[in-house]
């Protein structure tokens, strides 16, 4: 990845909205539309958990969400489902440590965006070796969204990775909301990933606007 590409990814990670049907009681399309109006910079379709859509239903929703992203020039990333990402010609794929092997995903998706969730320095180094364009780090804070989550580690891993001189783009993951987002950027992350702080907000547009403004102002102070 060239320096230019890396800078672009760092910008795109600023407010990284993640959502599936399990994360909102409203129509996902309406929530995403409002979040885009509020200024999210990347979107990940994560259709997991109890009652998650399967097969054609899942693909249909993904395609509709993708169209909204395309219209707004917001990168559309698929969580774990590599085949769906290929079928839709999505902008990228995000995988966790328990998902499909990152190196295999890179071979399948070519030069599309590849993100990998990481929980320690060794996993970060492995992700870089496997060809990741960015890493998600966390859980930074306690989260209700993922029931199988690892132990909370605050921003310590982000700080550690930056101290080791690793410049891979980083997005903080897990329990991040407006009132606790600033330390994530201050520690060296390029952005924050958000689920419920937008998807369960009464006003997703306003929530996204406030998060975008916060990230922008914190980055300006660095």
From Swiss-Prot:
Its annotated pathway reads:
Cofactor biosynthesis; thiamine diphosphate biosynthesis; thiamine phosphate from 4-amino-2-methyl-5-diphosphomethylpyrimidine and 4-methyl-5-(2-phosphoethyl)-thiazole: step 1/1
- Note the superkingdom of the native organism: Bacteria
Q: Note whether NAD occurs among the keywords.
A: no
Q: How is the cofactor bound?
A: Binds 1 Mg(2+) ion per subunit.
Q: Which InterPro entries match?
A: Aldolase_TIM (IPR013785), ThiamineP_synth_sf (IPR036206), ThiamineP_synth_TenI (IPR022998), TMP_synthase (IPR034291)
Which SUPFAM superfamilies does this entry report, sorted A to Z? Thiamin phosphate synthase
Q: Which UniProt keywords apply?
A: Magnesium, Metal-binding, Thiamine biosynthesis, Transferase
The protein's required cofactors: Mg(2+)
For biological process, the GO terms are: thiamine biosynthetic process; thiamine diphosphate biosynthetic process
- Asked if the keyword Transferase belongs to this entry, the reply reads yes
Q: Which residues bind 4-amino-2-methyl-5-(diphosphooxymethyl)pyrimidine?
A: 44-48, 79, 117, 146
* Binding positions for Mg(2+) per the UniProt entry: 80, 99
Q: Which reaction does it catalyse?
A: 2-[(2R,5Z)-2-carboxy-4-methylthiazol-5(2H)-ylidene]ethyl phosphate + 4-amino-2-methyl-5-(diphosphooxymethyl)pyrimidine + 2 H(+) = thiamine phosphate + CO2 + diphosphate; 2-(2-carboxy-4-methylthiazol-5-yl)ethyl phosphate + 4-amino-2-methyl-5-(diphosphooxymethyl)pyrimidine + 2 H(+) = thiamine phosphate + CO2 + diphosphate; 4-methyl-5-(2-phosphooxyethyl)-thiazole + 4-amino-2-methyl-5-(diphosphooxymethyl)pyrimidine + H(+) = thiamine phosphate + diphosphate
Q: Name one GO molecular function term.
A: magnesium ion binding
Q: Which residues bind 2-[(2R,5Z)-2-carboxy-4-methylthiazol-5(2H)-ylidene]ethyl phosphate?
A: 143-145, 175, 195-196
EC assignment? 2.5.1.3
Q: GO cellular-component terms in the record?
A: cytoplasm
Q: What does this protein do?
A: Condenses 4-methyl-5-(beta-hydroxyethyl)thiazole monophosphate (THZ-P) and 2-methyl-4-amino-5-hydroxymethyl pyrimidine pyrophosphate (HMP-PP) to form thiamine monophosphate (TMP).
Known NCBIfam families for this protein?
thiE
Q: Which family does it belong to?
A: Belongs to the thiamine-phosphate synthase family.
Specify the protein name: Thiamine-phosphate synthase
